[in-house]
Amino acid sequence: RNAIRVVGSRGEMGAGHMADAYARARKGLGCFITSTGPGAANAPGALVEARFAASPVIHLTGQTATANMDKEQGAVHDVMDQLGMLKSTSKSAYRIRAPEMALGVLMKAAREALTPPMGPVSVEIPIDVQRAKITRPAMLDNLVIAPPAGDAGNARSLDALADMAASAKRPMLWCGAGARYAGAAVQRLVDMGFGVVTSVNGRAVIPETHPMTLGAFQATPEVEKFYETVDFMLI
């Protein structure tokens, strides 16, 4: 309480893009909130962009009272199958059906958003659940939700890959969005003589002013011709 900085936006889609940008810039979890119904329906454009960019984002939205959900009874902003809409544009979407489920669902959503391939996860919270009072979980005092540990890989395969890289005369890195979280490793390979090209979402893994990068121009005819001169490419 009183430790969350709330930044307002002019619309729900803008809020989603702001959360996406925060996740990319801070290399952490972004979050935005929308109202139910039309408010939630304004979010999918931003959710699709975050999903395309593999940005870990939590989208919290409302829902009509649990007794009225999915019945088309004319409750305010009761959109039929709102959860289905969010599932189609998010990595996953969940509904908190009871107050005691809230922390567990939110933790699951955060972990899923942070699990590669990262992406946005939506969570519906019905209005009566929002208003309910529960005992504050003690685990909140020391709660840390970290990305899951990466796969260490097969040692023999990694050794073979290292041998190939060491013997290469013209090695190249092709970095996508996931490489944003491995900037130090990318820089080390660049310092060893690797050239770099990135996808649009992999931009800024290293500064595009660096003499060893071709930036995000990975599909131009000139660069594709250049690939033919490369004897080792790590993607």
Where do the model's predicted regions map?
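N-terminal alpha/beta PP-like core and its mobile active-site loop of ThDP/TPP-dependent enzymes
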Residues: R1-I235
